Amino acid sequence: MMNLVGLPAIENPFPLMHSPLVQCMTNVVTVESMANAILYVDGKPVMADQVWEFEDFMEQIDALLLNLGGFSPNIVQALLVASSQAQAKQIPTVVDLVGVAGSTLRLDLANKLLGNQPAVIKGNYSEMRRFCQLPTSGRGVDASDDDQADEAVNELAQAMQVLAAKSPQTLFLATGIKDIIAFEENVYYLENGVNQLDRFTGTGDIVGALIATLLGDGKDVMTATISAVSYFNLCGERARSTTKGLADFRQETLNQLSLLMEDSLWMNHIKGGQLGKL
């Protein structure tokens, strides 16, 4: 068990105890990257998004990922049905707030999904600011520079702590320069990663997929979140040290998903701490 300074004691989640089946309801842009990321860490993805299939798959899956990057009336209905069924069967669920910063409809959907007590709700700084009812200058699906300024980050951490206290069954994660975790009454931060991870699409989606995979493998929500975020960011750090160009960097980051776990000491490189009560 690794006792990180200022962070909860967590165990190395790799190798997985079994190959959890993760149902992913996601967008067409990053669906392949997410499926492969789950496979690279020895999970099993199923990209089932049709309501008439849910009853069968809910009997099989170990975790559910709801990514708001795909959006239409049919998708909204499917996300709500899947969320409700997963809650009834106590299947751990991750909700990814893709596009919430720029869309009132997605924000309304996210608030409805919160009512079904997902294990994790995640988004970038701008998405999480909107979800916490803070002003944001985010556009589209990307976080804005203003939302990543020190004062704005501190404001977000405080708002997330308030939200987590109101919804103690859910962990809230904001990804950015510092990844912020709010759970129950505590706020933590993680500091691994490189700027290049913001330069190819799907990095946040992959983190959501990794969190869901670890939850499906029976890991508690703090272990799953800290491990998934830090593991992916450390994969990026390794990739940057050996590649030139963003295409090669992307490929090597994905390669490292299956390789970094071979280093039994990888968790020694996790950087972060606890912010405490703000």
Where in the sequence are the language-model features?
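Conserved post-catalytic alpha-helical subdomain immediately downstream of the catalytic base
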Residues: 201, 209-252
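Glycine/small-residue-rich loop that forms an oxyanion/phosphate-binding "nest" at active or ligand-binding sites
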Residues: 75-123
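Acidic-glycine-rich active-site phosphate/pyrophosphate-binding loop
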Residues: 3-15, 171-192, 264
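Charged C-terminal helix
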Residues: 233-278
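General beta-strand structural signal in soluble alpha/beta enzymes
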Residues: 24, 46-48, 93-97, 121-125, ...
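Conserved N-terminal subdomain of the carbohydrate kinase-like
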Residues: 2-95
